[in-house]
């Protein structure tokens, strides 16, 4: 009985957490979606048939994209319980060994990842602006304070990131539950006054809407997609909460509340077309307007926090999988391993978000830029999930064809509609995606070229050990020397240089390789492998998941449990410090060389990244031409 109660309590806790983190973005979309369809740059004439058609498209977009695609299909593609586009890319690569196939999958994954960063810049700006615009509905005199108030809120949000959000995070679930109950109730009250709006659930209304307006109706899809922004979070945060809590909260709370609110806004527009200036806030009774603005502000801050945390987590994954240079990462919670703060990413997001708020000034103007980032990520997710369905799940060809045709037809329709908004701001996330994808691919390519150069100039471990047998070093100091080495280098460059210049080999030498697996967390039994070699050399391989932080001191404890005792006071860590210069040899293009060398110089030092004791580290420099 107690076990059942404990399981129920744990499930409810996870469900509340999912409400607070996963659904913040999609839950605040009613603030601007309907208004954008009928009052935005591609506004549709306000007639009852058009209102029913637009609401029908919103309902079926939520059902097909979120309920069917993400909740049923994509969430099945978990990488040992973890989700997100980097995890999906690693999963899609697992069965692909041809270089050309891997290159395409990596390019897709990197572009989708880059678009997610674009989403991370736009979500806080559009969400907080959308909430603050309620001030103009309350009284026209306050409309001038929308942008300044938004900037203050966003500044506070980004400045508290360094302290972590563990404490206030406990309030996210209850606040979002209150938000969903409130918007659902507001919609239901309006719906009861105009029940004929329920006809919008018939997909024929959506079809007629598109065919009747042709080009303009198709362009309106670019606004309809705003209703599904944040759908990617269902998959990205799966590792934190699990599939069941996310699925249950979607069908039990989020989906009904969203549909009720959208139908309620449509009912209001049928009764009062002038409400198009802000149908969300005009649903609210006058006495409840200020409390609702406060609740909406809290909900949009929570939505922004979820995206910011997602950007930190994605950066950590990209570094571990070697798609980005090392950066300083701070774990802000001792109990929650997913609580990460990336100072450089936080600064970049803050500057970008404030620039967007100042440049666009309203959620309506930002909506054009928003849709393209969201849909681009969705298309990439669909393609990668289809690769997994083919390679890993072994789906039959017909099932794969039908699923791909349905999902891609929806995704590509929304993508095409949003491409029409390139000139209105859609170029921002697209340009950002191309730039970031180029940065990540250049880093990956540059690292491969660098390791190839090191391998050329290095010596095989077996030959080096034979050299020690033939010509023993004149002096072997007491203690342990640990040399960090890449997975594809048999002999660390620092060891070779140290021996050539100093003719010194310590009494015990450990060659340490840290490998990142294509899954989030390494099992205890595979975390460490110890191999004894000649001349008191040891090769140690430690394995980490892409959600874990490499920690050398923790590795020393694992060695102790495995029977190899290492006294830290008698241990020196030798690191290679490579200085890169441009080479005449072909490997990277000239612009790639400049970019890679710049990133390499500015990467966070390995001493801090791997948590090495600074008083036990020796760096040996060398010049490498790439």
Curated annotation (Swiss-Prot):
**Where does the protein end up?**
Cell inner membrane
According to its UniProt entry, the function of this protein is described as: Transport of potassium into the cell. Likely operates as a K(+):H(+) symporter.
Regions that span the bilayer: 11-31, 55-75, 103-123, 140-160, 171-191, 216-236, 250-270, 282-302, 340-360, 369-389, 395-415, 422-442
What family does the Swiss-Prot or TrEMBL record give for this protein?
Answer: Belongs to the HAK/KUP transporter (TC 2.A.72) family.
What are the record keywords, sorted?
Answer: Cell inner membrane, Cell membrane, Ion transport, Membrane, Potassium, Potassium transport, Symport, Transmembrane, Transmembrane helix, Transport
Recorded GO MF terms: potassium ion transmembrane transporter activity; symporter activity
Kindly give the Pfam families that the UniProt entry links to this protein.
Answer: K_trans (PF02705), K_trans_C (PF22776)
Membrane topology designation? Multi-pass membrane protein
Reaction(s) the record says it catalyses: K(+)(in) + H(+)(in) = K(+)(out) + H(+)(out)
What's the protein called, per UniProt? Probable potassium transport system protein Kup
């Amino acid at each position: 009985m107690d076990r059942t109660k404990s399981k129920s309590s744990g499930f409810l806790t996870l469900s509340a957490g999912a409400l607070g983190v996963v659904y913040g973005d999609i839950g605040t979309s009613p603030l601007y979606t309907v208004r954008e369809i009928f009052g935005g740059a591609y506004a549709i004439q306000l007639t009852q048939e058009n209102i029913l058609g637009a609401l029908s498209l919103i309902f079926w977009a939520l059902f097909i994209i979120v309920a069917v695609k993400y909740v049923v299909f994509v969430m099945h593609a978990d990488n040992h319980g973890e989700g997100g586009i980097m995890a999906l890319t690693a999963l899609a690569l697992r069965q692909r060994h041809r270089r050309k196939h891997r290159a395409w999958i990596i390019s897709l994954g990197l572009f989708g990842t880059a678009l997610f960063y674009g989403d991370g810049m736009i979500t806080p700006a559009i969400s907080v602006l959308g909430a603050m615009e309620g001030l103009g509905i309350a009284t026209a005199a306050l409309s001038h304070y929308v942008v300044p108030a938004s900037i203050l809120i966003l500044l506070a949000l980004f400045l508290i990131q360094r302290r972590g959000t563990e404490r206030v995070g406990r309030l996210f679930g209850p606040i979002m539950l209150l938000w969903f109950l409130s918007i659902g109730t507001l919609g239901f009250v309006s719906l009861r006054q105009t029940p004929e709006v329920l006809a919008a659930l018939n997909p024929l209304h959506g079809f007629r809407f598109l065919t009747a307006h042709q080009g303009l109706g198709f362009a309106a899809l670019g606004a309809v997609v705003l209703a599904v922004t944040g759908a990617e979070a269902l998959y990205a945060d799966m590792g934190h909460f699990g599939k069941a809590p996310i699925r249950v909260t979607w069908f039990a709370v989020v989906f009904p509340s969203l549909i009720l609110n959208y139908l309620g806004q449509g009912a209001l527009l049928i009764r009062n077309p002038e409400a198009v200036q802000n149908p969300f806030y005009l649903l609210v009774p006058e006495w409840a307007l200020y409390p609702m603005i406060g609740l909406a502000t809290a909900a949009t801050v929570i939505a922004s926090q979820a995206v910011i945390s997602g950007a930190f987590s994605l950066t950590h994954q990209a570094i571990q999988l070697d798609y980005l240079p090392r950066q300083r990462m701070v774990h802000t919670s001792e109990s929650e391993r997913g609580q990460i703060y990336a100072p450089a990413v936080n600064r970049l997001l803050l500057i970008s978000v404030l620039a967007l708020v100042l440049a666009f000034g309203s959620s309506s103007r930002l909506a054009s830029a928003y849709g393209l980032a969201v849909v681009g990520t969705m298309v990439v997710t669909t393609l990668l999930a289809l690769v997994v369905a083919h390679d890993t799940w072994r789906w039959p060809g017909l099932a794969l064809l039908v699923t791909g045709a349905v999902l891609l037809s929806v995704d590509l329709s929304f993508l095409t509609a949003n491409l029409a908004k390139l000139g209105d701001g859609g170029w921002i996330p697209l340009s950002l995606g191309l730039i970031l994808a180029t940065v990540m691919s250049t880093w990956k390519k540059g690292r491969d070229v660098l390791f190839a150069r090191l391998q050329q100039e290095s010596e095989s471990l077996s030959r080096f050990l034979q050299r020690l047998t033939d010509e023993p070093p004149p002096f072997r100091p007491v203690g342990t020397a640990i040399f960090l080495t890449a997975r594809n280098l048999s002999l660390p460059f620092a060891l070779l240089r140290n021996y050539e210049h100093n003719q010194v080999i310590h009494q015990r030498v450990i060659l340490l390789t840290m490998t990142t697996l294509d899954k989030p967390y390494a099992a205890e039994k595979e975390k460490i492998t110890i191999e004894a070699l000649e001349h008191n050399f040891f090769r140690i391989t430690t394995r980490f998941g892409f959600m874990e932080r490499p920690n050398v001191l923790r590795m020393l404890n694992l060695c102790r449990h495995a029977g190899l005792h290492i006294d830290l006071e008698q241990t020196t860590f030798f690191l290679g410090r490579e200085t890169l210069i441009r080479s005449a040899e072909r490997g990277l293009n000239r612009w790639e060389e400049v970019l890679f060398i710049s990133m390499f110089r500015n990467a966070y030092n390995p001493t801090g990244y791997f948590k090495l004791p600074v008083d036990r580290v020796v760096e040996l420099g060398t010049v490498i031409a790439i």
